[in-house]
């Protein structure tokens, strides 16, 4: 037990205490304090608030969707990256709009400082440098925390966002050290405190690649990767990205790299047995890539600059815990990196997490009232997943403080809802990462319409100001008004229209057909028909995109909304005891194994099994009803 100290000289009671100041903690502290709660943020190091521990980037497939959702709900991550990004790209634009996703490289140190300054400016937020070693619990209710220096802080709401710092262990070859990040101490007491109250703990592993010095790389022989010429912001409050963009570069592993890894596998903690924990399935180490995908001749490696004012380059795709001397050889086997100098070695890290099925959908623990978990403590990986959970936990605290009914995010309205639902109902077997494939209604959850879906919740809590909310409503009023107009405009002969037809090589059309039908042609974009709807010429690219998507995909969107209705109707549908899952065409092997093992009695129970995706549940439903999807009764 840590000895308590006289602490009458500073405030020791708060509405909410947030433990940890990574991406989950920063978002939680901001939302809690912005919502009027007197909040204390405790971090072991003020200089690492908002630090990017691994890759210097925000967003990506599904992750970018969540950043936009966090922004729509009043969070800060989108604004932070818009202000500190050094390269912006919209990913997957060659595919359907549901999987378009913004991603940006960050000026790593600038991002961290921007988060710190933003939190420091919050009037309801206090920040202290200390650790939390114990929870203070009475009658299954949290009443405070006890810090590493012996101070007691009292509160009815604690949000734990401990990242990789719970009883953590760093591995580089046979080298081990009790760090939460390289050269930063672990926290042991809190794990013991959680176990004391019968919360189920487990161990997970993650890793990071080496960083190299830019001046030691021959960039001239590498493939250059530029950002978008007209970058899309993350935040709905950002009009335009005007910052200077810098390129990334691409190289590849080769036969020499793979031979080197195979020869030294026995020195990898993951393969020597030194690490027993489960690592991220979808972000494997370079050792795992070479072993698991032995038929591949090469693996892509991205060289990502960490900022304008640093020479460090992040080697995306080369996460490793091999010994440092092997890392040097590995890096120097890559084209363009023959003389590369490693300034920070890659490493693996093991850490404690709490089984997220211990949580309610509010992220409050079921066993301890007032205790909330967010981020990697819940078995997730990624800055964006962490930020989303921090926001949800803080929303829940604000609803509790105001005696409001908790807000439960739905799978059908947000990726955040998918994330929380997966965690609390399915749990995790390896570090959880969000993908668009996890969302069964992803056409409704596009990155461009997050404000329409979610901003009302932030507005209701006072986290989104009146001006922003009014701007959002006016935007969609404009879109809806012009959309209705497009349904009524007939195609008429004109010089401009004939030029468009000639340019696109279109011959099969009819004058008199409505403009919406013409816009649904894959080769026609909204910009092509602006001369017929001149009011959109002054719109932002985002508004034009929303209008185009809603018209082009209106049939699919309508079908998706109907699907939600019939799914809700059949959630309680019983699964026959004698069902043969192997006879269901299209069902994944993993899903078959899990379903045979768990033997769920209803579709809802099947949907809550880890490894069973929404598409698998759809197939089971169609099989039970003995019909194809389009034949299943909707109403």
Curated annotation (Swiss-Prot):
NAD(+) binds at residues 279-293. Coiled coil: none annotated. GO terms for biological process: tRNA methylation; tRNA wobble uridine modification. GO terms for molecular function: flavin adenine dinucleotide binding. FAD binds at residues 20-25. It is found in: Cytoplasm. Homodimer. Heterotetramer of two MnmE and two MnmG subunits. Belongs to the MnmG family. This is tRNA uridine 5-carboxymethylaminomethyl modification enzyme MnmG. The lineage of its organism: Bacteria, Pseudomonadati, Spirochaetota, Spirochaetia, Leptospirales. The gene is mnmG.
